[in-house]
From Swiss-Prot:
Major location (coarse): cytoplasm
Protein name as it appears in the record: Ribonuclease P protein component 3
UniProt subunit comment: Consists of a catalytic RNA component and at least 4-5 protein subunits.
UniProt keyword annotations, A-Z: Cytoplasm, Endonuclease, Hydrolase, Nuclease, tRNA processing
Membrane-crossing segments per the record: none
Coiled coil, from the record: none
EC number: 3.1.26.5
């Protein structure tokens, strides 16, 4: 199971500190989901912390015109590409973008989803994120609203059997919560223990799949370059 984190400069803690804390909490690795690049070397941090560090990115989607090009450029170098939209209509745009792995925090900051968006995500293989940050780090009405949005998302995801990931979205090592603690949050929105853990493992599956696609041996799904294949 992996956690998806925001490291310095987007967050308060370094990649190394987040990786070490996540490993201690029971994770096998982290996906670094910053808006931009970090100076950390994933391989070096992984060797020092005994946690796999995946180079990810989050694309801010505020308009359709420029978003496709930004997603294309990030896809060339990042192992995991998430995109966060600024409106429900742009949530649909992201859900229909096959270069995107994860529609990040679709219910946050006034966001919303409906059956059309969830079905599009299923069709295009885009994972819908259950971002527990608003439950873990908010209180009062904000926490109630976050729970309400996540319950709605769960009902739609279950009904249409759409792919999903789960994250606490820690921006500091102090925000990292163990899988068991995230399971407890999941129970508040109607998830089972197995569903929350499956959502955490989905980051692992995405990283493994996309690393294969970025490797020199990959040609197309189901096809790898062998001894008789040569570059044209």
């Amino acid at each position: 199971m992996y956690e998806a984190v925001c490291a310095h400069p987007d967050g308060d803690s370094t990649v190394a500190r987040l990786a070490a804390t996540a490993a201690s909490a029971g994770y096998d690795g982290i996906v670094v989901r910053n808006w931009g690049a970090t100076s950390a070397d994933p391989d070096a941090v992984g060797a020092d912390t005994d946690a796999d560090v995946v180079r990810g990115t989050t694309v801010s989607v505020t308009d359709r015109a420029g978003a496709s090009e930004r997603i294309r450029r990030r896809r060339e170098n990042a192992v995991v590409v998430a995109a966060r939209a600024s409106s429900p209509s742009l949530n649909r745009f992201v859900a229909e973008s096959e270069r995107v792995d994860v529609l990040a925090a679709p219910m946050a900051d006034g966001g919303d989803v409906n059956h059309v968006i969830v079905k599009a995500a299923r069709t295009h293989g885009v994972r819908l994120e259950f971002d527990f940050a608003g439950v873990l780090r908010a209180s009062g009405g904000d926490r109630v609203q976050a729970l309400r949005g996540l319950r709605k998302l769960r009902e739609l995801v279950e009904h249409y059997d759409a792919p999903f990931v789960v994250s606490g979205r820690p921006a500091s090592h102090l925000h990292v919560r163990s899988p068991r603690e995230l399971v407890a949050v999941g129970a508040e929105i109607g998830f089972t223990d197995a569903q929350v853990r499956a959502g955490l493992r989905e980051w692992t599956h995405l990283a493994a799949r996309n690393r294969r696609r970025l490797s020199a041996e990959f040609i197309a799904p189901g096809v790898k370059r062998g001894r008789y294949e040569e570059d044209p």
